[in-house]
């Protein structure tokens, strides 16, 4: 990493269960980010076509009844609106990155065969798919929707911003998964999430300090009123996802955000000097590690 680069977290609400319309919205937002001079845009966890909230997914656990039947209809719609990789929607995302000459990182529901995966796709400014990572372990209700990820993408990619890598939501709480990125030299750490709690920010501050990297946490923002009317939502607040996106420095301080309860774009300038100074005292996979005693093996 060298110099100063501008990045963006795009806390936007998808057009729920409408893949094409959501990508249309993404395209407009990426154009705005590019016009502001940012070199990377990060979107929330499974932005395309929507994050599967427990407000309806809980009903998938039932064997019968009207709610279970309605939830299965919604699951079928989610499957039909998911992204295939490679495929036309992935190609369109790649073209959006190329047309705007930036790095585009977006969370998608990815369909592979008969299984949906929670995936992070990172496209390069030349329109290539540079990183394809599937969430290793779905959390709680998500196990009714997504399959288990694999070891692909547990690494960084070289970019003009520095080495970029990422983990999805609560996989960021898995120490070995984090260390996989540390030993790959991560400098810009992507953390798309659906966790809109205050506790999440304690984790992000810790990860920034532990990794000595810049951390971009982009969180789901979703209103109950934005769902199609036939989605069986359990009673609850209007905000299904309250956001809380933020960009953090290697010392755990905020460079931008948190942004709560609304759509918006966060920008921050990442200065490589901050990263280098932070690593004088601590480097988790370098001078403050003991590879002679402790070693991570990725299968």
Map each language-model feature to its residues:
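N-terminal phosphate-binding loop and adjacent alpha-helix
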Residues: 11-28
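C-terminal beta-strand edge segments of enzyme domains
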Residues: 220-299
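Active-site catalytic loop in hydrolytic enzyme cores
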Residues: 84-85, 89-91, 95, 110-187, ...
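Extreme N-terminal starter segment of soluble prokaryotic enzymes
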Residues: 2-9
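Short beta-strand scaffold segments in enzyme catalytic cores
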Residues: 106-108, 119-122, 155, 245-247, ...
